[in-house]
Amino acid sequence: MKRLTVLLISLFLAASAIAADPTIEEIVNRANLATYYQGKDGRAHVKMTITDSQGRKRMRKLTILRWDQPDTDELENGAYRGKQKFYVYFSRPADVNKMVFLVWKNLDKDDDRWLYLPALDLVKRIAASDKRTSFVGSDFFYEDVSGRDIDEDEHELLKTTDKYFVIKNTPKDPSSVEFAYYKMYIHKKTFLPIQVEYYDAQDKKYRVAKALKVENIQGHPTVTKASMESLNQGSKTVMEYSSVKYDTGIPEDIFTERYLRKPPRKYLK
């Protein structure tokens, strides 16, 4: 009887452990929430350092504002995927001062992206086909800044380690991207992607993103230092985030063409 009791307890504990493991959908959804949707809105100052293959460095300073809909952090309420708007204001160096990158993330169509060039007083619309191109000369792409729609890829759990869920993501439309697939190493506790590796059709790794520093800000695990390395070009970009703040009450009307030429100073400080 004692052996039977021990066996039943062991089976119960094993079943509980299996039930506790999140599904691939839950992992991907939580990772998207942790990366792009924490808080109802957000603001961060960013220092971007671009290092080319010769070791030459260029620096940019910018501020990122974000607004979400729905304004929730509840996973069951769709917080991991919703309409979202980004306003990226550049302050340094002089040649990019007052330049603005604006994004409207849409659920039922391609995202809308605009770039305001103050020297020309020109608002340039960025085509959907250009989302996988360099963001202001860095190793990050436009899509890296605002995020890739999770429904654009098929997701497969390759393995689980003591720290990470390792996910393989394959595009549903291979012709729309330059990669064959990418792997994400998602932290099991925070659900933040700590490393993302991009592979080409020859199964060669050519691009690597890393979360170099994570801090807890207002209860949200937040990446405050990240890098993107282009292995083929030998270049690397590091982004350092400071003065990060969530739930600031940023109004939606800031994320319009009117504010491309009239920066919302109050929220950029």
Describe the function of each predicted region.
Residues 249-269:
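Gram-negative outer-membrane assembly/targeting C-terminal domains
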Residues 102-106, 112-116, 122-127, 131-150, ...:
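Gly/Pro-enriched, hydrophobic low-complexity segments
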Residues 159:
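Short, contiguous, pocket-lining structural segments
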